[in-house]
Amino acid sequence: MATVILVRHGRSTANVSGMLAGRTPGVELDDVGTSQAIRTAERLTVVPLVAVVASPLERCEQTARHILDAQSAAPSSVVENAITECDYGDWQGQPLSLLSLEKLWSVVQTHPSAATFPRGESLAAMQARSVGAIRRWDAAIEAEHGSNAVWVAVSHGDIIKSVLADALGMHLDLFQRITVDPASVSIVRYGSTRPTVFTTNSDSGDLSWLNHSAPVADAPVGGGAGHDAALPAGS
């Protein structure tokens, strides 16, 4: 079973201004976001990636480029429209402070599976396309590169939250309980019977254990010995 590292783009100019960017063109990383993306890319250098699949929006492409440039080998680079940002419709480009006054805001917060943005996408449709794309890419990468393959998907906060909710077996109505910060790392491995979530919203720490991690089948009763159990003796 391959392993997918879900990376949110670094902080964007819209994040700083408090605007819901959505698919607005020209929204790029700010200086802090660029530094965040570089740090995440450096953190991933210990893992030989086979592919970097990214949303087509500029802030994700910029984050993906830093990851690709930091790799010693040359992972394949793919733009995937199915993991682009949610289509927020008329909400796109609006200040979050004003959107929070809309009646739909409370639906998005407490009952997101029922939320459809005006002249936009429903959160349920967003999750369906995103989860479908991640699972398709994961299966294709495992078929081509084997069960030890590790790849990255660079996407957006709500997209990654919805993928994690699916992997955790959570209803979409609970996905607002998940936090995904800019340039954070979340790690999922899809098994034959269920996904396993290793990490969520991580911005520090060694990831070299991914090079030695044994495939997950049954969950260890009691919690198991952790990542170090898969390391070679003496390491």
Task: Kindly give the residue locations of the regions a language model identified.
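Extreme N-terminal starter segment of soluble prokaryotic enzymes
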Residues: 1-5, 51
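Acidic, low-complexity terminal tails and accessory targeting/binding regions
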Residues: 2, 86-97, 143-149, 166-235
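General small-molecule cofactor/ligand-binding pocket signal
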Residues: 5, 78-80, 198
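Active-site metal-binding loops of divalent metal-dependent hydrolases
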Residues: 10, 157, 202
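Loop-to-helix element that buttresses phosphate recognition and phosphoryl-transfer chemistry
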Residues: 11-62, 66-67, 116-131
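Phosphate-coordination/substrate-recognition cap region in phosphate-metabolizing enzymes
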Residues: 38-106, 234-235
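Short glycine/proline- and acidic residue-enriched helix-loop micro-motifs
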Residues: 104-125, 222-228
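GST-like fold's C-terminal all-alpha helical module
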Residues: 126-157
